[in-house]
């Protein structure tokens, strides 16, 4: 069993109510909000909450996916299927200059690749469509720089984050006032934990990308990470042969930069049980979080989510 007690269900309902309140506040307060959809488990929960917030209607904002062109194939298939099911507009943005220049995580390194294909691409999209608020699925328990984030994260006209220039958030009162060109990144899942996310997915029967479930997959070991060979673009090193292992992913990103974990957890109760025994962060498998000192905070200051 998943071990979700009645008290635990009450806790999840409180988190749900808080998130729905935040989503409705943004829809009421901002002129042109958007929901960033990264296709991961947190995005799936956030989308589910948005649909609940405006049921039986459709959420009054579009979904947007910043596509680096290096996502897992199963992620893109899942994205297209979910967009069709929920009936929301899906905006896909690719940094065409970066793609034309052939920017990739192998020849250019994870730091430059992330800056060009994620950070700059996101800023391009926000400017192009004039969004004044963008929902994201980040949680405070994920990583140190995210632990000090506000629910409403103020960004200047260059989309930069200054942790010393943020607004107080008293109780459930949020200040969304922005000048022309400024914006707010909004994190409705700020107070959720990874365990909360999984238990809520189980209780609400929320569909997620199959990569979260353990299965035999071809992987190679690099820098202590199990990298899945998702397509022919992954260059194999001399003598490197993919090995089929039972693995799953705790977090999903670009496949050359996302490490799998060895696991046999193929159902939600098994994943939750595994979570209860795990003592490492889910983002320990994301190379972009460790490519330089203070990596995530530096990226956020430059405009990353």
Curated annotation (Swiss-Prot):
<dbReference type="InterPro" id="IPR002500">
    <property type="entry name" value="PAPS_reduct_dom"/>
</dbReference>
<keyword id="KW-0547">Nucleotide-binding</keyword>
<keyword id="KW-0548">Nucleotidyltransferase</keyword>
<dbReference type="GO" id="GO:0000103">
    <property type="term" value="P:sulfate assimilation"/>
</dbReference>
<protein>
    <recommendedName>
        <fullName>Sulfate adenylyltransferase subunit 2 1</fullName>
        <ecNumber>2.7.7.4</ecNumber>
    </recommendedName>
</protein>
<comment type="function">
    <text>With CysN forms the ATP sulfurylase (ATPS) that catalyzes the adenylation of sulfate producing adenosine 5'-phosphosulfate (APS) and diphosphate, the first enzymatic step in sulfur assimilation pathway. APS synthesis involves the formation of a high-energy phosphoric-sulfuric acid anhydride bond driven by GTP hydrolysis by CysN coupled to ATP hydrolysis by CysD.</text>
</comment>
<keyword id="KW-0067">ATP-binding</keyword>
<dbReference type="InterPro" id="IPR014729">
    <property type="entry name" value="Rossmann-like_a/b/a_fold"/>
</dbReference>
<dbReference type="GO" id="GO:0005524">
    <property type="term" value="F:ATP binding"/>
</dbReference>
<dbReference type="InterPro" id="IPR050128">
    <property type="entry name" value="Sulfate_adenylyltrnsfr_sub2"/>
</dbReference>
<dbReference type="GO" id="GO:0004781">
    <property type="term" value="F:sulfate adenylyltransferase (ATP) activity"/>
</dbReference>
<dbReference type="Pfam" id="PF01507">
    <property type="entry name" value="PAPS_reduct"/>
</dbReference>
<dbReference type="GO" id="GO:0070814">
    <property type="term" value="P:hydrogen sulfide biosynthetic process"/>
</dbReference>
<feature type="region of interest" description="Disordered">
    <location>
        <begin position="283"/>
        <end position="305"/>
    </location>
</feature>
<comment type="similarity">
    <text>Belongs to the PAPS reductase family. CysD subfamily.</text>
</comment>
<comment type="pathway">
    <text>Sulfur metabolism; hydrogen sulfide biosynthesis; sulfite from sulfate: step 1/3.</text>
</comment>
<dbReference type="InterPro" id="IPR011784">
    <property type="entry name" value="SO4_adenylTrfase_ssu"/>
</dbReference>
<comment type="subunit">
    <text>Heterodimer composed of CysD, the smaller subunit, and CysN.</text>
</comment>
<keyword id="KW-0808">Transferase</keyword>
